[in-house]
């Protein structure tokens, strides 16, 4: 939040930026423009994700906007991503040819749902020993018999 520009969200095309709690109760509205780019480079972002126990997955890489490839045009060498997410609009085989020519990064699919009817339109199956973040991380790396299933 501190790395966002101090611009207000008062443009007519900006919808309410709701602040909610864990019970989905509205606590208020953010006056700051949350769609703006943060003053962080991509290496710092991935490092923060990993430091906080998360998985760094470049989302909807096949989209013409709001994706790693639309912004940079490539994966920077040394960027420690855990996976690349492809929308249902592109086949995984085609995405493999276009975005990453080897198996160094797994390709995954998620719903990226913005409306209830879109939930479940895409998914990824994993072989895990337990339902934990560490197991997901191991599956992304293909270690210890864990894996990401390509469909």
Question: Language-model features: where?
Answer:
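A structural motif
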Residues: 7-25
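Surface-exposed cleft-lining segments at the edges of enzyme active sites
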Residues: 24-37
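Charged catalytic cores and adjacent phosphate/nucleic-acid-binding surfaces used
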Residues: 4, 16-20, 33-34, 47, ...
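Divalent metal-dependent hydrolysis catalytic cores, especially in the metallo-beta-lactamase
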Residues: 28, 54-57
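Phosphate-interacting basic helix/loop segments used at nucleotide- and nucleic-acid interfaces
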Residues: 38-49
């Amino acid at each position: 939040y501190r790395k966002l520009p101090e611009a207000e969200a008062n443009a007519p095309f900006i919808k309410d930026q709701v602040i909610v709690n864990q019970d989905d109760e509205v606590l208020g509205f953010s006056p700051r423009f949350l769609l703006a780019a943060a003053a962080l480079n991509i290496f710092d972002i991935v490092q923060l994700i990993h430091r906080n126990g998360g998985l760094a997955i470049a989302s909807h890489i096949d989209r013409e906007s709001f994706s790693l490839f639309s912004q940079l045009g490539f994966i920077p060498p040394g960027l420690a991503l855990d996976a690349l997410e492809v929308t249902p609009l592109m086949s995984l085989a085609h995405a493999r040819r276009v975005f990453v020519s080897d198996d160094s990064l797994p390709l995954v699919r998620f719903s990226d749902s913005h409306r209830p009817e879109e939930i479940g339109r895409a998914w990824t199956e994993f072989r895990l020993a337990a339902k934990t973040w560490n197991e997901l991380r191991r599956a992304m790396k293909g270690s210890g018999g864990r894996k990401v299933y390509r469909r």
